[in-house]
C-alpha cells in the first residue's frame, strides 16, 4: 500500500532513500538506535550496552510505555530465585509440560523449551539490574492478587485437566511496591521499568524523550543506516506539549472504559490531545546514524 492511499492511517512514512552514509549530515551517530523506550526497548538497550555497543534510545513521549502503567507482572518459572524463596517447587521440565498443553503447536518445542530453560535466568537478570520482587504467595488462581501478595497463579496450572501432566506452580511475579500503593493495581510497572532505565543510563545510554521516529533512512543497497526523528528544539513549546499530554493522560485514567462516564472524560481528553497535536507541526528534524542497526520497539 502506498502512503498516498486513502486507507493509509499510520503516521509512519516511507523511508528516506540516500546513496550512502556520506550523503547525510548526521546530527547523532551510535552503534544502535532503539526506537520506543518501553520494556522491550530498555531491555534491548541494556543487553546491547553490556555487549559493548553505544546506544541511543528515542521515545515519542516520556518513555516507559505500557510497561509503566501495568501491574508490574512478569510470567516466569522453572525454579526462579523468587519461587525458591517462596518455597514453590517448579522445574523447567514441569513448566514446559504445563505450557505445552496451553500452546500446543502454536510455537515450536524448541522455542518453548528455551523459554522455560532460561526463565530463571531472566529473573536473575532483572534482579541484577536492580528490580526487586516480593515473595509472599497467593495460592489460588487469580488474574491479579491482593497488594500483600507478589507471587501468584496467573495461569491455569491449577485446573484439573492440566494437573494430569504437570504439577501446579505459581509463576506470576510482581515487582515489589509498598502495599498501600499496590492497592491501585495499575501504574505499578515503574517498579520494573525504573531500575532498568537507571541501569541503562548508568552504563552510558543516551536517552532522548519526546523524539518521534516516522522514517528510517536506507541506502542504495536497502540497508537501514539510520532514522529521522522529530523533536521540539524550543523548550517552551516542549513544556507546553508535555503539559497537554499529561492532562489528557490524567483524564483518560479517571475511569476505566467499562464504567459509565468514561466517554465524557475521553472526549475531553481527545480535545486536549488535538491541541497537543497542533504543536507537532512546529517540531524540527534530527538525523541519527545507526552504525550497526535499528531496533523498533514502539508498540
Question: What is the predicted function of each stretch?
Answer:
Residues 2-23:
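Extended, non-globular alpha-helical segments
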Residues 11-14, 116-284, 291:
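Conserved redox-cofactor binding core of oxidoreductases
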Residues 25-30, 281-293, 297:
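Core beta-strand elements of the Rossmann-like FAD/NAD(P) dinucleotide-binding domain
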Residues 30-57:
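N-terminal Rossmann-like FAD-binding beta1-loop-alpha1 element of flavoenzymes
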Residues 35, 76, 296-297:
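Redox-cofactor binding/interface segments in oxidoreductases and associated redox assembly factors
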Residues 50-71:
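Glycine-rich FAD pyrophosphate-binding loop
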Residues 61, 233, 292-293, 297-299:
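Glycine-/small-residue-rich beta->alpha transition segments that form the dinucleotide
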Residues 75-115, 127:
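Glycine-rich active-site loop/strand segments that organize a redox cofactor
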Amino acid at each position: 500500500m502506498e502512503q498516498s492511499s486513502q486507507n493509509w492511517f499510520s503516521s509512519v512514512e516511507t523511508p528516506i532513500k540516500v546513496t550512502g552514509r556520506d550523503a547525510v549530515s548526521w546530527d547523532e551517530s551510535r552503534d544502535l538506535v532503539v526506537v520506543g523506550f518501553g520494556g522491550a526497548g530498555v531491555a534491548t538497550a541494556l543487553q546491547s550496552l553490556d555487549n559493548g555497543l553505544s546506544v541511543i534510545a528515542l521515545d515519542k513521549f516520556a518513555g516507559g510505555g505500557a510497561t509503566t502503567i501495568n501491574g508490574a507482572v512478569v510470567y516466569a518459572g522453572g525454579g526462579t530465585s523468587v519461587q525458591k524463596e517462596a518455597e514453590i517447587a517448579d522445574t523447567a521440565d514441569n513448566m514446559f509440560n504445563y505450557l505445552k498443553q496451553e500452546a500446543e503447536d502454536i510455537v515450536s518445542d524448541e522455542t518453548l523449551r528455551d523459554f522455560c530453560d532460561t526463565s530463571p535466568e531472566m529473573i536473575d537478570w532483572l534482579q541484577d539490574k536492580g528490580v526487586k520482587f516480593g515473595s509472599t504467595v497467593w495460592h489460588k488462581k487469580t488474574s491479579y492478587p491482593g497488594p500483600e501478595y507478589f507471587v501468584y497463579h496467573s495461569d491455569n496450572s491449577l485446573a484439573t485437566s492440566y494437573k494430569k501432566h504437570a504439577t501446579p506452580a505459581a509463576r506470576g511475579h510482581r515487582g515489589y511496591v509498598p502495599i498501600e500503593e499496590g492497592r491501585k493495581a495499575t501504574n505499578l510497572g515503574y517498579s520494573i521499568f525504573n531500575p532498568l532505565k537507571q541501569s541503562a543510563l548508568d552504563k552510558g545510554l543516551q536517552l532522548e524523550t519526546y523524539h518521534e521516529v516516522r522514517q528510517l533512512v536506507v541506502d542504495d543497497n536497502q540497508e537501514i543506516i539510520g532514522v529521522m526523528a522529530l523533536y521540539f528544539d524550543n523548550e517552551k513549546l516542549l513544556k507546553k506539549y508535555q503539559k497537554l499530554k499529561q492532562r489528557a493522560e490524567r483524564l483518560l485514567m479517571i475511569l476505566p472504559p467499562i464504567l459509565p462516564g468514561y466517554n465524557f472524560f475521553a472526549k475531553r481528553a481527545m480535545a486536549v490531545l488535538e491541541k497537543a497535536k497542533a504543536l507537532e507541526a512546529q517540531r524540527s528534524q534530527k538525523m541519527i546514524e545507526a552504525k550497526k542497526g535499528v531496533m523498533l520497539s514502539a508498540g
